[in-house]
Amino acid sequence: MAVAVGRPSNEELRNLSLSGHVGFDSLPDQLVNKSTSQGFCFNILCVGETGIGKSTLMDTLFNTKFESDPATHNEPGVRLKARSYELQESNVRLKLTIVDTVGFGDQINKDDSYKPIVEYIDAQFEAYLQEELKIKRSLFNYHDTRIHACLYFIAPTGHSLKSLDLVTMKKLDSKVNIIPIIAKADTIAKNELHKFKSKIMSELVSNGVQIYQFPTDEETVAEINATMSVHLPFAVVGSTEEVKIGNKMAKARQYPWGVVQVENENHCDFVKLREMLIRVNMEDLREQTHTRHYELYRRCKLEEMGFKDTDPDSKPFSLQETYEAKRNEFLGELQKKEEEMRQMFVMRVKEKEAELKEAEKELHEKFDLLKRTHQEEKKKVEDKKKELEEEVSNFQKKKAAAQLLQSQAQQSGAQQTKKDKDKKNPWLCTE
């Protein structure tokens, strides 16, 4: 029988019986129909070394062939490549995004290999937060790119986790749902595989790495999740090749020594991974991403912006009060900055004026020095000119005197010559 719940002013709840059918028992159907028409999105981050089988496992999980480019081991750094696909099963549409970590683990110095991954996850959170903070939000049409599940591919060494794996998972565990898996599990003997799993889980616990916990609080999935949790990390094998086994064709990897069936639970944990990731807990992964990881990021960002739920006295703070407080704080800082800039401008102007005055003084001094030098040089030139003029005048006088003496000498010589002639020819005179 349907039951109505009211909330009186005294906050006590009373159960009321309905006298007839109302219709809100169809709410689950309405929600299912609405969700089905909208479709779903699911974003998977694959973290692992180059060539460890990330693309093959994705193809096997979703029973299709996704686009993938062959990667080399020569990447200078880690970069993330995201590809989105539209899938449909029955009448349910799924927008699937697969993000690959290209070049992860290929560098000699692996200290910062996790940073591009963390930055990518934060960038998706930031994009969603910016959409939420818009005045006109459109979350209905927004393509949510937040990472819902991180499949962390562990190399099948059979010994222990690499330091790179521990550091990366520790940096990611507060930002994403980590599901550790052992890749290419068919390369490890079965007895060694159990020891390897135990060693991995022990190292994760001792290093404080928080991996995704399958929910056990819902009766419908509690039993299967509790059973599957003991198999972590899942040891998987991926293959899209069909091999004939008896009278049937099955996905498997064929070796000279035998066949490893992908969907045979005695051979690997692929079926367990698919059940846990897709069939049972896909919605919980989406919910955990929003309510846990995104909320943590959102809270930290809003606190950085100065938004808090309580004031220093632990009293509730309204959004309006927070806004006014931040606005006043911002205006105060703005006025302070303006005053600092004004003072700095005045100081710079004074410094410039002093520099200009000093430069002007130096120019005047240089001008006076040049003027004095010019006058001195002019005086020297004039004195030299006067000396030269006197020398020319004296030279002219001497020249005139010399010419006069020469002329007189010539005249005297001519007269003497005539006298001498007269003495030699006296008869000329008598005649």
From Swiss-Prot:
Highly expressed in cerebellum, olfactory bulb, hippocampus, cerebral cortex, thalamus, and corpus striatum. In the hippocampus, strong expression around the pyramidal cells of the stratum pyramidale and in the stratum lucidum of the CA2-CA3 regions. In the olfactory bulb, particularly strong expression in the external plexiform layer. In the cerebellum, concentrates in the molecular layer, particularly in Purkinje cells, where it is found at the base of dendritic spines/protrusions, at the dendritic branching points and in some GABAergic synapses. Disulfide bonds: none annotated. Residues 183-186 are annotated as: G4 motif. Residues 38-304 form the Septin-type G domain. The modification Phosphoserine is found at S9. GTP binds at residues 48-55, 103, 184-192, 238, 253. Keywords: Acetylation, Cell cycle, Cell division, Cell projection, Coiled coil, Cytoplasm, Cytoskeleton, GTP-binding, Nucleotide-binding, Phosphoprotein, Synapse. It is found in: Cytoplasm, Cytoskeleton; Synapse; Cell projection, Dendritic spine; Cell projection, Axon. Residues 401-416 have a biased composition (Low complexity). One of its GO terms (biological process) is protein localization. Residues 100-103 are annotated as: G3 motif. Residues 320-408 form a coiled coil. Residues 400-431 are annotated as: Disordered. The keyword Chloroplast does not apply. One of its GO terms (cellular component) is GABA-ergic synapse. GO terms for molecular function: GTP binding; GTPase activity; molecular adaptor activity. InterPro entries: G_SEPTIN_dom, P-loop_NTPase, Septin. Filament-forming cytoskeletal GTPase. May play a role in cytokinesis (Potential). May play a role in the cytoarchitecture of neurons, including dendritic arborization and dendritic spines, and in GABAergic synaptic connectivity. Septins polymerize into heterooligomeric protein complexes that form filaments, and can associate with cellular membranes, actin filaments and microtubules. Forms homooligomers. GTPase activity is required for filament formation. Interacts with SEPTIN7. Interacts with SEPTIN9 and SEPTIN12. PANTHER family: SEPTIN. This is Septin-11.
